[in-house]
Amino acid sequence: MARVCAITGRKARSGNSRSHAMNATKRKWGANLQKVRVRINGKVQRVYVSARALKSGKIERV
């Protein structure tokens, strides 16, 4: 199971970490994903859901 939101498709983003000398090093920003139990097609499943999807009411916990 990849760490991707089952509702919105949000996932980790990549970019650069910059030092004081402006040297660039690759790094990742992870999405705020929570593993929650939700009802999908009448079945209770445990999936990764972004905090934004939970707060906006796009999905409801079981």
UniProtKB/Swiss-Prot annotation:
Keywords associated with the record: Ribonucleoprotein, Ribosomal protein
Q: Which GO terms describe its cellular component?
A: ribonucleoprotein complex; ribosome
The UniProt entry's coiled-coil ranges are none
Q: Does the keyword Nucleus apply?
A: no
Q: Which GO terms describe its molecular function?
A: structural constituent of ribosome
The record's section on InterPro entries has: Bacterial_rp_bL28 (IPR050096), Ribosomal_bL28 (IPR026569), Ribosomal_bL28/bL31-like_sf (IPR034704), Ribosomal_bL28_bact-type (IPR001383), Ribosomal_bL28_sf (IPR037147)
Give the region (Disordered) as residue ranges: 1-28
SUPFAM superfamilies (UniProt xref): L28p-like
| Gene Ontology biological-process entries | translation
Q: Which residues form the signal peptide?
A: none
Q: Which domain of life is it from?
A: Bacteria
Family in the record: Belongs to the bacterial ribosomal protein bL28 family.
The record ties this protein, via NCBIfam families, to: L28 (TIGR00009)
Q: What is this protein called?
A: Large ribosomal subunit protein bL28
What is the originating organism of this protein? Bacillus cytotoxicus (strain DSM 22905 / CIP 110041 / 391-98 / NVH 391-98)
Gene name, Swiss-Prot/TrEMBL? rpmB
